[in-house]
A protein has these predicted regions:
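Short, well-structured N-terminal submotif of metal-dependent ribonuclease cores
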Residues: 1-41, 51-67
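Acidic, PIN/NYN-like endoribonuclease modules and their adjacent C-terminal/linker elements
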Residues: 1-9, 103-133
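Generic structural signal for small/hydrophobic residues in well-ordered secondary structure
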Residues: 14-15, 49, 82, 106
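Alpha-helix capping/helix-boundary segments
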Residues: 17-18, 45, 78, 101-102, ...
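Nucleotide phosphate-binding site architecture
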Residues: 18-19, 47-50, 122, 130
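Acidic catalytic patch
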Residues: 69-91
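Acidic donor-binding loop at a coil-to-helix junction in glycosyltransferase catalytic cores
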Residues: 97-98
Length: 133
């Protein structure tokens, strides 16, 4: 008899979750460790991570970390949907463009978006933080 393989959705991790992991926060380390085989990164998240790099050694550490995951490039469709999310939720909910594009990327990839600040994602229903701080 053959075995049944259950495919699980990818997990698109937000920058805050990854920064917590890189800083050694226990809950983030546990989260990334548990789901590492399913985690994907958005090109936007990669840009945000590099924007926060300090010193000369950190870029190499960050590059090695990013290499562990599949990075989803930004497509025109993701940019369009992200722009519409920003238009629709930017003023009313304080949604920034990066968060809007991240939500659009999760939609396009059919991925679970794992974040810390659910207020940034009113366009996605049922959002829960990846872990409680």
């Amino acid at each position: 008899m053959g075995s049944i393989v259950v495919m699980q959705n990818s997990i698109l991790a937000d920058t805050d979750v990854l920064v917590d992991f890189l800083r050694g926060h226990e809950k983030a380390v546990a989260f990334i460790s548990e789901f590492s085989s399913r985690i994907i990164l958005s090109a936007i998240v990669v840009a945000e991570l590099y924007a926060g790099v300090k010193g000369n050694a950190e870029p190499a550490v960050l590059e090695n970390f990013i290499f562990l995951f599949r990075v989803v490039p930004l497509t025109t469709e993701m940019a369009k949907i992200g722009g519409l999310y920003k238009r629709d939720f930017g003023k009313s909910h304080g949604v920034g463009l990066a968060d809007a594009i991240l939500a659009a990327t999760a939609d396009a990839e059919k991925a679970e978006l794992k974040i810390l600040n659910v207020k940034h994602y009113p366009m996605l229903s049922g959002m829960e933080p990846a872990y409680k701080k």
